[in-house]
Amino acid sequence: MADSEALPSLAGDPVAVEALLRAVFGVVVDEAIQKGTSVSQKVCEWKEPEELKQLLDLELRSQGESQKQILERCRAVIRYSVKTGHPRFFNQLFSGLDPHALAGRIITESLNTSQYTYEIAPVFVLMEEEVLRKLRALVGWSSGDGIFCPGGSISNMYAVNLARYQRYPDCKQRGLRTLPPLALFTSKECHYSIQKGAAFLGLGTDSVRVVKADERGKMVPEDLERQIGMAEAEGAVPFLVSATSGTTVLGAFDPLEAIADVCQRHGLWLHVDAAWGGSVLLSQTHRHLLDGIQRADSVAWNPHKLLAAGLQCSALLLQDTSNLLKRCHGSQASYLFQQDKFYDVALDTGDKVVQCGRRVDCLKLWLMWKAQGDQGLERRIDQAFVLARYLVEEMKKREGFELVMEPEFVNVCFWFVPPSLRGKQESPDYHERLSKVAPVLKERMVKEGSMMIGYQPHGTRGNFFRVVVANSALTCADMDFLLNELERLGQDL
């Protein structure tokens, strides 16, 4: 087929299909994987929105394009996308590229099935069951339930819904009008999905009682006890506490044993949002950070974050063995969940979720785990802690780096103090001027494509950087580069 000809439908032409896919895979390997993970290449190729629209030629037209043009489209998509597998990408709680997980993602997309019944996803139903069993065992449960969800936010929302249903099962049929005012409790450092979940589930954000956190970002159990008493005095019914293991900004781990004691005294559902910190359970050295997690009723854990399983890979784990997920979320659609099937219908998982179609998220994690084993994944976690500590110690040797606090996880939070502000901490406008530094440096690094680091204000603190040390390909040289690059970018400030 000539390059100038429009690409016809490939249906029924296996030779053409193979040729196209081999060509596309070649582009992916060259551009997204080899270049996208090389320190000799940029993390991103920044373009302003209008320029990017022109470069991509986004308009969808009546006529198709040639195979040559399609391959150029693929190259352009990769070229102008952020390379999250790059060793200099420190911007989010996910980074890196695991080849076995990527292989699992490719297979998943190729098979294009929905994980709601055993009859159309037999391999993945059994695989998901085994992966969830393994995750529960790491939490400390010998039995239980669980499901893969489309992100940690949904896992957290499911936990709230399950806790409400367990206490008031009539609400599934009769709705909110049957409920008294409810109260749930979480730290001010919690993920924003708790507030969004309360709104989405009809509880309202006023039902979320915000518990104090200490100077390190950990929930204060004494204030939790106080907030529960206040809610009851106001006529609300407490039903859930959401603790956090690995907060988004500071990387704090709530004191789960003390929080579990409070929940036990008051008969409250304990949910642990371990979306970020759950993978620490794989480390014998560091799993003490989650001591008490086995006392939770539910746990959210995102292996797509620290384990780099690839977006998305988010598990909700339950200690419950009463089929609570299906009772709460099920609707028994007769065209999917026939009860007279030729196999054990308990294998059909679709009624555990509020979705109908559900993508397969277990294969990438299973394949990576098969390749790495517990020991390989543990080394990955431990190395992240080692490199985070290396970065902190190197910062202390240099002028111009001020830690927000000593990290206990792999979130390293700090200010870069440029030359013009050094020694001027007592100036009345010092903090205001310091807060303006991170946005300027972020713009410079992104537009050069040298690296990406996130920043944010936090409480009374002005903007500071948060480096996430999670990519298993990182070395001490990458940590040194980060510090050197900040010094270079900020030398004139």
From Swiss-Prot:
GO CC term (a single one): cytoplasm
Annotated Pfam families: Pyridoxal_deC
One GO MF term attached to the UniProt entry: aspartate 1-decarboxylase activity
Coiled-coil regions, chain positions: none
Known EC number: 4.1.1.29, 4.1.1.11
Tissue specificity of this protein: Expressed in liver and brain. Also expressed in both astrocytes and neurons, but lower levels are expressed in astrocytes.
Keyword Acetylation part of the UniProt annotation: no
Presence of keyword Lyase: yes
UniProt GO BP: L-cysteine catabolic process to hypotaurine; L-cysteine catabolic process to taurine; taurine biosynthetic process
Keyword line: Decarboxylase, Lyase, Pyridoxal phosphate
Description of how the protein assembles with itself and partners: Homodimer.
Family: Belongs to the group II decarboxylase family.
Name this protein carries in UniProt: Cysteine sulfinic acid decarboxylase
Organism encoding this protein: Homo sapiens (Human)
Lineage: Eukaryota, Metazoa, Chordata, Craniata, Vertebrata
Gene: CSAD
